[in-house]
């Protein structure tokens, strides 16, 4: 038996021999898991088929242990047969574990039903069949029957191995045949159990589902394929060949689609048809689809295909002969497309490739159905081709997949140039030309498309394997890393800006400065030179198009090449012609007056230049005219007329995408007006503030003759002081190019604010506003959120009002209950906020008690103090407050009913009847104040309150309770009759006289018979609680609810009801939709260990949250007081409570499942109508058959309309993993599936399928749902290869799971999002936006939704980020959608038109690196393909954001990287060229333009400081200031002041202030603005400016973009100095120190005036930037200035800096490893990137060149020799340092004496040299300091150049020296940055101030942040669970 686990072929039938004494390894690290239950889940992937057997064994173990043992033995045998040598991963360990277990069970288990195993298993099988299957068919649900049939099938397989075939008795065999026959009907299903019998779920009984299923099952007259099968073919395959249930199975039999794919798409198409068919259809019963249903679905599905055929001038293969069954054929075509799409895997990203496949397969279908050979008769036809269920995958998808994968390998893990490999877009665009038909059908694998220029050999199969040889050319576009892309993509904008700048300079230069000077003939003539500039720029654009697309030329059509060459030739012609013409016109000047007056004269008299310009601008004039008529332009783009095609060919290259994107006239007018106003403001500001004031000083500088320089001037005779002019104008030009972004921020803020106000945003923003408008909320609710037939009713009668209240109360109460379950509100808040569900008992509307709180006590006091004589006056006072009036009437009527119900004695009731009659009569007759003593009311109120308190209290002794109740009630009666009623004794007497049994009346006390059992009745108890609240709540409920988040949600929900949203359709009419969430390895649910694990400060997550959310923690503890909850549940509740406050998958899933909860409530309201009982819905159960039917129907409709799929890509690996985190992720995801039965999980399953002694990996897309205890597999679809290795992770993850989504809409939700029940209720309204008629516009394809950032509650950083993000997702996207019309898709809660997008490439793009920001490309793609994106703010979805500086910076870096890659992409190029001019401006400034402007802001500072340094060091500044007035350079400072606005983050703050003002009031906005400034928001934004500019620039130059996972945890932890240094060294610290050096040099050597306020502002702003970049990470680092942590940080930093690196040493451990990683981008950059990097490094040599001439030792010499000698000194110093370093290495250990002698000699030499320099050459200490300033930058430049030239330097053998130089610089930089921190850490007040700064939000809420920071905690509190 030992051999069995090690590889022998034979397997013994008995386990009597001992197994090897190897320890079980399979169950290691599986805490809290039942081993017997889990073994089925730990099966190695290569043995996956035995998992069901082990599950069955576990299932039946309690029932019959012996049969369970036999099942396990069968599993072991099967495993051994599958992998006899145990070669698969984990197989040996698993078999060993199973063997041990079998040996143990063989001895422990004995047969129970018979004497031996064969009889035992037969008896058990028969019992199982009779007990569960036979009886269960009519009583059990399909999912239960599926499980039972699976068990029965497995049991029979086991039985056959135990019992020889002849000995299986007849009964067993008959049962097994019955199981086999019916098994297909009971397979695990997703939503529709289509073939189930017996008890069918309500969903399959819906008429629309029946009709759709019937249509799909119509296989009449479809020919059957007959194949000559080999004689040994199994019977199952033969049966499968002949049995066809529906159209999809017929297609599968013809083309070989997988079974899982067929089942998946069958349900998909049935649900699509059912949902479309029921819309606007009122029939309750029908069995046929509407003819229009299938036609409409077909039109939508094939709109893209028709477009593709038209573009390629190919005839569509969607053919319909006259005599065909059209609906059947339409369904065949739709099903075929969906089956192709469902199995296409990564090819789904190539929609036109799918069109090509469908085009050919549709032709095949037509051939099969309507060929001349075979009539459509339903007969079989013969064929030699054998089709199995993987034929389509093998012959069609896999070859294309291999091409994609081979190209992806060229990417070399994202390091190769984009031009070296073809991405998804390149391969897809191959199918945009007719040459795609050369691929042929069936696919010709020798076609050019499939042939790589170098075939990849099997040994090169690893993903990043380097491939050799030339790559194949790109298609249509080449992504090249260069900043020229910005000009190439947006050439019209840059040409406009350059021309405008030139025109303004000319006008300012030649005239008086007035814009009217342009009409002067000389000025106008010169202004016309802007067209020469335009011609040159156009030539540049034409050249760039040729150069940058060079790698795609081989794939270009001749017409494309011709166009590029002609464009270049024409541009070149104009670039030559216009300057020549202008030079001619100089001799014959022409003015504007003469020009216009002689226009009709002889052209020969006119300037040739004028005519040339006229012809030059003619195309632009035509384009402008077309721009004004968008429909005409759209028609031209889509036209097939040859003249128009020629014109459009010249205007823009013909492309499949980007046609007809022009907006309607009104939209055009709106965004054109926006931009014209903006550009006028910008240009006027530029002209009058920046350009015009600088003209005069420029002229003066150009006229100065400067002969004295302070350095060696290379061009001493250069005219006009051109260097100074460049130094002064460079910052001005940069600000001019950048400040449009500032004007955009201003205008978008204004327009966005106005648009938001007109959208009714923020009309209800406080609880006071809520109260004042609450009466109108139910009506608004009915109008917006109830189906339209109800909303149209006139609100005139009480019935309608009551109906409004009933519908509203159900939803409102569920909303309140959901907030209570989330612990947002307390029990008291809940009671005060609920609307009574039994509201028909009283004559007035019953409002929530929080509106009526304190109204009764106030009314009582008012009546007590009333001095008037008339009832009417008192009642008028009460009625003046409507809520008080409602409260008084309700209290009186409710009290009356409560008392009547309590009293059992008829006589007592008569007494009370007399009392109430007296009250009613006195009010009618207006003598109330005369009949009643008002002074007695307070006493009565108090006593009633006490009575109700006792009534509601819990009691143990019924007698005591009853006596207390009676006593207090008698007191109440006494007060009424004696203190309140003036004639109380008369009333009592009257009641006694009217008693029918007065003579027989017993001598007993009144009011002793009270029915105390009524309290158990829920509805009655609700009334008592409500009345008690009305009487007892003395204070105003103005602060109910207390929780800020609860307030925000209530006010937003109430406000949204008054906003413009579509009317709600009936549930059956609403669009069906899915939600898709991609998940990788993030936290699902925190474990108990996670909750209590303490960080270095002794803080656990639980403790932190207890302190941050104290009210929610208290509410949670109150909720746990329910004695029914077991302890186990309490610990689970604690984990959930913590997880729901983090950014976890559990939080996201809970939020998304609110959709289903809301749908079920809406369905229930509609189905049940007036019979709806809220208590039944809340319990989701009832004994009433009608109510049961209502609930079942509600669930069915919810299933029909909503699907939620979480794509857990690595769930399968997590399931098998031994890692604790992965394992917990698996168990938590499983728990989510079990908790939410409608949740579906998709994952990629990796299996090793053993064949020929190999275990190749096979990949599947699998869909799961929760079963009884474990997950249940629904669909399994084989993939052509690993799907996630080709593109970016997230879009690939979405793509593999998108096939399992359903419906017409798809919402993409990230796993850091949340949702709210009340918002989920609005979803059907939002989905109606897809059907909303829009004048002149297309229907939307993406609906953008508003987001609420839920992570801004504590630290200032979280608050800044939350506000910044909130402003972007509200006012930012509002303005993008309307008026600018450039909103795309930003990742999170957007809702896609699902069919539109699945037929056009999906919801995102996935090419490696270029599509790093994958989500926005989904929006680009949608827009380019004719989509239309909107934005809606009446609904919101929660979103988490990063809350610490480091995670925020990583996120910003990721986004900046993504924008860098976007700049290179074809999508941005196409949008930039296809949009009209103004929409293109919107597109630029709201996407990559923002990041380029950020970079320009930083470059402006550099340009200013380096320009000033040039002027200072050369001596030019000194000379200019001596000869000129200082006030003449103010324009430069004004321009830089503009730039600093951007730098300080005011651009971010403007939209924030506007949005906060809109939604919370402008007073709050202004206060928040000032608080943000006090909390150093400007430091934060300035710091982020550095992050954006660094990563954006580096990505364009060198690439190296990668997905950066960001922190989703809690923030309060201290980041070490070394960690901050690693993160910010290159992006901020180096640049900050460079600017510091520039400022210091300027301060030392500059001679500038210092009086100007603007100068001071600019200087301060630049110092501010330096300070922010160097110290922001430490200012925003918790405990950043605590002395002990500072000491620890220094120790850690020194250790990190000193440790040597090497292979496998992480960057956190060694500086050397980090240093190598930091240069990674330089290894893979292009030669262009290397040259640019070296060029940029040369700027550091300027310091040395400038400073050496300022030294005293130079003796004022201007000879170049001085600079040369300085290099000798520098190189000598470096050589000495190198000698010391080498000496330490060679002699330091073994020859210590030699090393000391060497050091002494060097020291003596140094002293000698210094002495000579001081004495002979007059060297000073100042010179020494200046030399440090000179040589430090030079050394850094050498280091930078050395890093770029790493390979040659390594070859020279001096790389170690470069490395040591690098380490020395890191030491210096670290010391400079660390020193101020160390000094400040000495002062404890600094640390306290920092804590206040960081956590002001928490302090203002009274939170114990100091305890969190200090790590002190109350153990009792934190351990309380």
UniProtKB/Swiss-Prot annotation:
Function: Probably involved in callose synthesis, but not required for callose formation after wounding or pathogen attack. During plant growth and development, callose is found as a transitory component of the cell plate in dividing cells, is a major component of pollen mother cell walls and pollen tubes, and is found as a structural component of plasmodesmatal canals.
Name the record gives this protein: Putative callose synthase 6
A biological process term (GO) from this entry: (1->3)-beta-D-glucan biosynthetic process
Catalytic activity: [(1->3)-beta-D-glucosyl](n) + UDP-alpha-D-glucose = [(1->3)-beta-D-glucosyl](n+1) + UDP + H(+)
Keyword Transcription: no
Gene source species: Arabidopsis thaliana (Mouse-ear cress)
Record-linked InterPro entries: FKS1-like_dom1 (IPR026899), Glyco_trans_48_dom (IPR003440), Vta1/CALS_N (IPR039431), Vta1/CALS_N_sf (IPR023175)
Sequence segments annotated as region (Disordered): 1-23
UniProt keyword Hydrolase, yes or no: no
UniProt record similarity statement: Belongs to the glycosyltransferase 48 family.
Parts of the chain that traverse the membrane: 493-513, 527-547, 561-581, 612-632, 675-695, 722-742, 1485-1505, 1541-1561, 1565-1585, 1629-1649, 1656-1676, 1731-1751, 1760-1780, 1797-1817, 1824-1844, 1868-1888
């Amino acid at each position: 038996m030992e051999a069995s686990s090690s590889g022998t072929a034979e397997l013994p039938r008995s386990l009597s021999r001992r197994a090897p004494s190897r320890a079980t390894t399979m169950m290691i690290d599986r805490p809290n898991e039942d081993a017997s239950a889990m073994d089925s889940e730990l099966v190695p992937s290569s043995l996956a088929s035995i998992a069901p057997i082990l599950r069955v064994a576990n299932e039946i173990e309690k029932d019959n242990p012996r049969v369970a043992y036999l099942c396990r033995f069968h599993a072991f045998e099967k495993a051994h047969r599958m992998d006899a040598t145990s070669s698969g991963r984990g197989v040996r360990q698993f078999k060993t574990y199973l063997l041990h277990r079998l040996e143990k069970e063989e001895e422990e288990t004995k047969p129970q039903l018979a004497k031996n195993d064969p009889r035992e298993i037969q008896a058990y099988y028969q019992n199982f069949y009779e007990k569960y299957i036979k009886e269960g068919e009519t009583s059990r649900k399909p999912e239960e029957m599926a499980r039972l049939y699976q068990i029965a099938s497995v049991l029979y397989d086991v039985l056959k191995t135990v019992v020889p075939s002849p000995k299986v008795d007849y009964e067993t065999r008959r049962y097994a045949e019955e199981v086999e026959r019916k098994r297909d009907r009971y397979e695990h299903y997703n939503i529709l159990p289509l073939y189930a019998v017996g008890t069918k779920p309500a969903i399959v009984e819906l008429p629309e589902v029946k009709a759709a299923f019937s249509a799909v099952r119509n296989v009449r007259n479809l020919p059957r394929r007959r194949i000559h099968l080999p004689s040994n073919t199994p019977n199952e395959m033969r049966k499968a060949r002949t049995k066809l249930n529906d159209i999809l199975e017929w297609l599968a039999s013809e083309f070989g689609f997988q079974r899982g794919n067929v089942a998946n798409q069958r349900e998909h198409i049935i649900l699509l048809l059912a949902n479309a068919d029921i819309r606007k259809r009122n029939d309750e019963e029908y069995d046929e689809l509407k003819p229009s249903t299938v036609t409409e679905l077909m039109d939508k599905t094939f709109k893209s295909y028709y477009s593709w055929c038209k573009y390629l001038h190919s005839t569509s293969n969607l053919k319909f002969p006259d005599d065909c069954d059209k609906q059947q054929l339409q369904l065949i075509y739709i099903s075929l497309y969906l089956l192709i799409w469902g199995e296409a895997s990564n090819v789904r990203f190539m929609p036109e490739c799918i069109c090509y496949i469908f085009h050919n397969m549709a032709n095949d279908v037509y051939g099969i159905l309507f060929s001349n050979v075979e009539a459509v008769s339903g007969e079989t036809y013969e064929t030699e081709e054998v089709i199995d269920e993987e034929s389509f995958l093998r012959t069609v998808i896999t070859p294309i997949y291999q091409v994609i994968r081979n190209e992806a390998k060229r990417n070399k893990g994202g390091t190769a140039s984009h031009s070296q490999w073809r991405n998804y877009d390149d391969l897809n665009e191959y199918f945009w030309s007719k040459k795609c038909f050369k691929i042929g059908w069936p696919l010709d694998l020798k076609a050019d498309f499939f042939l790589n220029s170098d075939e990849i050999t099997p040994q090169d199969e690893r993903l990043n394997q380097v491939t050799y040889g030339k790559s194949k050319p790109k298609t249509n576009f080449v992504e090249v890393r260069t900043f020229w892309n910005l000009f190439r993509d947006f050439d019209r904008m840059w040409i406009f800006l350059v021309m405008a700048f030139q025109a303004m300079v000319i006008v300012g230069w030649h005239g008086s400065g007035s814009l009217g000077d342009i009409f002067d003939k000389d000025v106008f003539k010169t202004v016309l030179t802007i067209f020469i500039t335009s011609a040159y720029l156009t030539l540049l654009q034409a050249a760039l198009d040729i150069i940058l697309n060079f790698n795609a030329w081989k794939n270009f059509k001749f017409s494309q090449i011709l166009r590029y060459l002609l464009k270049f030739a024409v541009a070149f012609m104009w670039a030559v012609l216009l300057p020549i013409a202008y030079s001619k016109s100089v001799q014959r000047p022409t003015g504007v007056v003469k020009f216009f007056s002689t226009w009709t004269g002889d052209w020969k008299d006119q300037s040739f230049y004028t005519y040339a310009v006229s012809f030059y601008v003619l195309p632009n004039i035509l384009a402008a005219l077309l721009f004004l008529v968008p429909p005409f332009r759209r028609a031209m783009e889509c036209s097939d007329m040859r003249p128009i095609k020629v014109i459009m060919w010249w205007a823009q290259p013909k492309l499949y995408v980007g046609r007809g994107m022009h907006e309607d006239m009104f939209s055009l007018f709106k965004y054109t007006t926006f931009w014209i106003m903006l550009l006028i403001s910008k240009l006027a500001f530029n002209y009058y503030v920046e350009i015009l004031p600088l003209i005069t000083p420029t002229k003066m500088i150009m006229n100065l003759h400067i002969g004295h320089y302070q350095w060696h001037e290379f061009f001493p005779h250069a005219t006009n002081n051109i260097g100074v002019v460049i130094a002064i104008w460079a910052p001005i030009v940069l600000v001019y190019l950048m400040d449009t972004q500032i004007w955009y921020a201003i205008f978008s803020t204004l327009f966005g604010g106005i648009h938001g106000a007109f959208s009714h945003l923020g009309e209800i923003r406080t609880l006071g506003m809520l109260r004042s408008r609450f009466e109108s909320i139910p009506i608004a609710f009915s109008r917006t959120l109830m189906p339209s037939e109800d909303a149209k009713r006139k609100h005139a009668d009480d019935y309608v009002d009551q109906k409004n209240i009933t519908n509203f109360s159900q939803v409102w109460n569920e909303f309140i209950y959901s907030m209570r379950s989330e612990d947002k509100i307390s029990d008291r808040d809940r009671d005060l906020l609920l609307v009574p569900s039994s509201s028909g008992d009283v004559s007035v509307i019953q409002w929530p008690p929080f509106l009526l709180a304190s109204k009764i006590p106030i009314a009582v006091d008012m009546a007590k103090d009333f001095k008037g004589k008339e009832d009417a006056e008192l009642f008028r006072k009460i009625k003046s407050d409507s809520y008080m009036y409602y409260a008084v009437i309700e209290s009186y009527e409710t009290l009356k009913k409560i008392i009547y119900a309590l009293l059992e004695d008829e006589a007592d009731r008569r007494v009370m009847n007399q009392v109430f009659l007296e009250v009613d009569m006195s009010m009618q007759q207006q003598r109330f104040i005369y009949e009643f003593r008002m002074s007695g009311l307070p006493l009565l109120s108090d006593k009633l309150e006490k009575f109700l308190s006792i009534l509601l209290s819990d009691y143990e002794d019924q007698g005591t309770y009853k006596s207390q109740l009676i006593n207090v009630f008698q007191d109440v009666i006494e007060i009424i009759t004696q203190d309140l009623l003036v004639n109380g004794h008369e009333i009592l007497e009257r009641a006694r006289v009217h008693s029918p049994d007065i003579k027989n009346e017993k001598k007993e006390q009144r009011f002793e018979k009270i029915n105390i059992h009524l309290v158990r009745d829920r509805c009655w108890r609700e009334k008592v609680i409500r009345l008690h609240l009305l009487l007892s709540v003395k204070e105003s409920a103005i602060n109910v609810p207390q929780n800020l988040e609860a307030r925000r949600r209530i006010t937003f929900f109430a406000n949204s009801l008054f906003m413009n949203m579509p009317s709600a359709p009936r549930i059956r009419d609403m669009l069906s939709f899915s939600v898709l969430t991609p998940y990788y390895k993030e936290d699902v649910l925190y474990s108990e260990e996670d909750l209590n694990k303490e960080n270095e400060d002794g803080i656990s997550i639980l403790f932190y949250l207890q302190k941050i959310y104290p009210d929610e923690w208290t509410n949670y503890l109150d909720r746990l007081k329910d004695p029914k909850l077991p302890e186990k549940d309490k610990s689970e509740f604690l984990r959930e409570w913590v997880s729901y406050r983090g950014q976890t998958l559990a939080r996201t899933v809970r939020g998304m499942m609110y959709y289903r909860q809301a749908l079920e409530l809406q369905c229930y309201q509609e189905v049940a109508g007036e019979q709806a009982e809220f208590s039944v819905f809340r319990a989701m159960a009832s004994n009433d058959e009608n109510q049961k039917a209502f609930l079942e129907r509600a669930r069915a409709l919810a299933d029909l309309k909503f699907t939620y799929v979480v794509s857990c890509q690595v769930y399968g690996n997590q399931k098998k993993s031994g890692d604790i985190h992965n394992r917990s992720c698996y168990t938590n995801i499983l728990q989510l599936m079990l908790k939410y039965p409608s949740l579906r999980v998709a994952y990629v399953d990796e299996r090793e399928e053993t064949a020929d002694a190999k275990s190749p990996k096979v990949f599947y897309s699998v869909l799961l749902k929760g079963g009884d205890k474990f997950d249940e597999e629904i669909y399994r679809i084989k993939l052509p290869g690993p799907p996630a290795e080709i593109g970016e992770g997230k879009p690939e993850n979405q793509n593999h799971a998108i096939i399992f989504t359903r419906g017409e809409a798809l919402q993409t939700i990230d796993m850091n999002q949340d949702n709210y029940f009340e918002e989920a209720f609005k979803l059907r309204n939002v989905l109606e936006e897809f059907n909303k008629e829009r004048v002149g516009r297309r229907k939307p394809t993406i609906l953008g939704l508003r987001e609420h950032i839920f992570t801004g509650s504590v630290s200032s950083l979280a608050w800044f980020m939350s506000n910044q993000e909130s402003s972007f997702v509200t006012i930012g996207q509002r303005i993008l959608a309307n008026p600018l019309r450039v909103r795309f898709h930003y990742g999170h809660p957007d809702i896609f038109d699902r069919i539109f997008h699945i037929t056009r490439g999906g919801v995102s793009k996935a090419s490696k690196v270029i599509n790093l920001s994958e989500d926005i490309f989904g929006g680009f793609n949608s827009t380019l393909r004719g989509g239309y994106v909107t934005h809606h703010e009446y609904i919101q979805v929660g979103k988490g954001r990063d809350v610490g500086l480091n995670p925020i910076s990583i996120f910003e870096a990721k986004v900046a990287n993504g924008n860098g890659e976007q700049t290179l992409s074809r999508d941005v190029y196409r949008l930039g060229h296809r949009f009209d001019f103004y929409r293109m401006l919107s597109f630029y400034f709201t996407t990559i333009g923002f990041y380029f402007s950020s970079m320009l802001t930083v470059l402006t500072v550099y340009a200013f400081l380096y320009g000033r340094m040039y002027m200072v060091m050369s001596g030019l500044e000194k000379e200019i200031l001596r000869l000129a007035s200082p006030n003449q350079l103010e324009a430069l400072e004004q321009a830089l002041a503009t730039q600093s606005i951007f730098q300080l983050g005011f651009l971010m703050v403007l939209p924030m202030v506007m949005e906060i003002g809109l939604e919370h009031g402008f007073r709050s906005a202004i206060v928040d603005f000032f608080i943000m400034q006090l909390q150093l928001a400007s430091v934060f934004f300035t710091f982020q400016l550095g992050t954006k500019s660094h990563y954006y620039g580096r990505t364009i130059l060198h690439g190296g973009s990668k997905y950066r996972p960001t922190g989703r945890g809690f923030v309060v932890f201290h980041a070490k100095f070394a960690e901050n240094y690693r993160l910010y060294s290159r992006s901020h610290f180096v640049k900050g120190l460079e600017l510091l050096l520039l400022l210091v040099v300027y301060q030392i050597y500059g001679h500038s005036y210092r009086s100007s306020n603007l100068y001071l502002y600019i200087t301060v702003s630049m110092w501010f930037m330096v300070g922010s970049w160097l110290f922001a990470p430490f200012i925003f680092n918790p405990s950043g200035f605590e002395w002990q942590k500072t000491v620890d940080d220094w120790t850690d930093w020194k250790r990190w800096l000193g440790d040597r690196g090497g292979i496998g040493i992480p960057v956190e451990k060694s500086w050397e490893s980090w240093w190598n990683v930091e240069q990674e981008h330089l290894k893979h950059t292009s030669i262009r990137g290397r040259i640019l990097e070296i060029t940029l490094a040369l700027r550091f040599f300027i310091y040395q060149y400038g400073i050496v001439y300022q030294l005293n030792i130079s003796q004022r010499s201007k000879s170049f020799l001085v600079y040369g000698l300085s290099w000798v000194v520098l190189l000598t110093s470096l050589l000495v340092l190198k000698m010391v370093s080498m000496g330490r290495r060679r002699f330091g250990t073994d020859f210590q004496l030699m090393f000391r002698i060497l050091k002494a000699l060097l020291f003596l030499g140094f002293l000698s040299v210094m002495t000579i320099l001081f004495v002979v050459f007059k060297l000073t200490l100042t010179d020494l300091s200046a030399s440090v300033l000179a040589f430090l930058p030079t050394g850094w430049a050498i280091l930078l150049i050395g890093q770029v030239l790493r390979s040659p330097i390594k070859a020279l053998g001096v790389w170690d020296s470069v490395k040591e130089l690098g380490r020395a610089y890191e030491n210096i930089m670290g010391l400079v940055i660390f020193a101020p921190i160390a000094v400040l850490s000495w002062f404890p007040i600094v640390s306290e101030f920092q804590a206040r700064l960081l956590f002001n939000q928490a302090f203002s809420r009274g939170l114990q942040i100091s305890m969190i920071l200090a790590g002190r905690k109350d153990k009792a509190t934190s351990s309380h669970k």
